[in-house]
Amino acid sequence: MTQFASPVLHSLLDTDAYKLHMQQAVFHHYYDVQVAAEFRCRGDDLLGIYADAIREQVDAMQHLRLLEDEFQWLSGLPFFKPDYLNWLREFRYNPAQVCVTNDNGKLNIRLTGPWREVIMWEVPLLAVISELVHHYRSPNAGVDQALDALESKLVDFTALTANLDMSRFHLMDFGTRRRFSREVQQAIVKRLQQESWFVGTSNYDLARRLALTPMGTQAHEWFQAHQQISPDLATSQRAALAAWLNEYPDQLGIALTDCITMDAFLRDFGIEFASRYQGLRHDSGDPVAWGEKAIAHYEKLGIDPLTKTLVFSDNLDLPKAVELYRHFASRVQLSFGIGTRLTCDIPQVKPLNIVIKLVECNGKPVAKLSDSPGKTICHDKAFVRALRKAFDLPQVRKAS
């Protein structure tokens, strides 16, 4: 299936902020590290028929580059260094790093190459896949339907929060990867800008063009890669946390907790890390139980939870965010990142549950053992066993 009218992507910055944040850290600390990543469809969608169209879009991405006004805008942000931005100015996507195949209807994608380059593919490639699939499946849906659905949700949201002090409710758009389309995401974000509780977007292109705050720190791959970068598996998570602080000592301090389960994370998250990081991000498992564990951990360390921020970003919608806000608002700072339920929430449109995750670093396996067993990713069962042993995980989690 080919002949999509034009390139889906128009800007190198049409990606999530944490990709550039991680890329700069990799550029400075792990320039020669090699990785492999793979696509997963967590649903039952057979997406292989779109392989040719996806390959065309991958080839078109080699023409994206950082434009001068984009370079100047990034230069004005406090955490990017000139050496990295000058390198990014010369960066081009290399389609040879991407293998796209149709395996009897199943879409297979494997990415290989230097981590500093491969790191950039995940978010825009997922956005491309999502937009292509929805273009063919739902040709009559688009911005109008998405905005109508959002307005309905906002009416319900207003009623749901009528008796609440919403002054500490902060919502972010995390919807780039699985958006219906670029145009839908932009329309949704522009509408949300009218709400006082909307604080920013993870999409750097939208943040620049709409004068919004870009949001994001690091992703699972940062912790996964350290499983092979670090000489000792048992200390690899601490090594990842320390390396991040080395790159960003006073900024971008929200740590992701579920690469090797929340319990294993908290064992590594001692007083120095807990003091220096501004907060934690939830991305799998029961959000209330997770938040209670986080607050209890801070209190045990003698840290006032009200000085820290919990970011919830796992399969959220507005009612779930309000429920969590009601539960936690008096005890800790809160932010909520909503993705698919904002940028691909259209009647009769089935969002894709798709990811691209790291599977190897320097030719050796890495794993994600999240707080939701269905999100576990690793090919190598022996490595999963070693990881469980190193982090004293009590429960067998099936590798997939």
From Swiss-Prot:
Keyword entries, A-Z: Ligase, Luminescence, Phosphoprotein, Photoprotein, Pyridine nucleotide biosynthesis
CDD domains: PncB_like
UniProt KW Cytoplasm keyword: no
Gene3D superfamilies: nicotinate phosphoribosyltransferase
Superkingdom per UniProt: Bacteria
Pathway(s) of this molecule: Cofactor biosynthesis; NAD(+) biosynthesis; nicotinate D-ribonucleotide from nicotinate: step 1/1
Family: Belongs to the NAPRTase family.
Matches recorded under PANTHER family: NICOTINATE PHOSPHORIBOSYLTRANSFERASE
The protein's name in its UniProt record: Nicotinate phosphoribosyltransferase
Biological source species: Salmonella typhimurium (strain LT2 / SGSC1412 / ATCC 700720)
